[in-house]
């Protein structure tokens, strides 16, 4: 099979590659975007801009209008970093443009106990992302429709990603009402009868016989 570009002169191939590289570099340059939005760049491995907490919603709206999508929300506790920081906490928002591949981090510096506006009204993807930051760092997002824990148990005290969270072993209490298995799965654990999962207790001991391998039993009417 002949390569599609086999008949092209080598100089043309080099020129085409150079133009493609230049266009890609230009498309990823966010300096003009920062100038349009009136943002100042901050040091970072990826293009990063500082945003005042009171300007976050307006900046996010401007980015959404330009076609940017929200990829991630990250909370950081800088309180014990050796280098001085403007505030002990920060929330970083990773946004990207799906067509020209520009990517930008917005960093909002926050003091202890300071809240920041939720971006859920602008990007629905902020829902679980902000809940995760709230759960692990305790940063609250004003205007979030359902700000509650999403990863840690409800009765866990503190926020695991804060620098003041105590290190060491935390006992896990498997008590009734905290980790509640479905009743059908519990029935399967006994080995006496199959639950809706098709699980049998013998398999738990490694006794996997051919007659034990059965398809899952579905609820009446099929999957729910």
Swiss-Prot record:
Gene Ontology MF term list: NADH dehydrogenase (ubiquinone) activity; NADH:ubiquinone reductase (non-electrogenic) activity; quinone binding
Keywords: Cell membrane, Membrane, NAD, Quinone, Translocase, Transport
Reaction(s) catalysed by this chain's protein: a quinone + NADH + 5 H(+)(in) = a quinol + NAD(+) + 4 H(+)(out)
Family annotation (Pfam families): Complex1_30kDa
Protein topology in the membrane: Peripheral membrane protein
Major location (coarse): membrane
InterPro entries per UniProt: NADH_DH_suC (IPR010218), NADH_quin_OxRdtase_su_C/D-like (IPR037232), NADH_UbQ_OxRdtase_30kDa_su (IPR001268), NADH_UbQ_OxRdtase_CS (IPR020396)
Protein EC: 7.1.1.-
Basic and acidic residues bias locations: 202-213
Location(s), subcellular: Cell membrane
Keyword Cell wall biogenesis/degradation included in the entry's annotation: no
Matching PROSITE patterns: COMPLEX1_30K (PS00542)
One cellular-component annotation, GO: plasma membrane
Region described as Disordered: 202-224
Keyword Translocase (UniProt): yes
Biological role stated in the UniProt entry: NDH-1 shuttles electrons from NADH, via FMN and iron-sulfur (Fe-S) centers, to quinones in the respiratory chain. The immediate electron acceptor for the enzyme in this species is believed to be a menaquinone. Couples the redox reaction to proton translocation (for every two electrons transferred, four hydrogen ions are translocated across the cytoplasmic membrane), and thus conserves the redox energy in a proton gradient.
Subunit structure: NDH-1 is composed of 15 different subunits. Subunits NuoB, C, D, E, F, and G constitute the peripheral sector of the complex.
Family listed: Belongs to the complex I 30 kDa subunit family.
The protein's name: NADH-quinone oxidoreductase subunit C
Phylogenetic classification of the source organism: Bacteria, Thermotogati, Deinococcota, Deinococci, Deinococcales
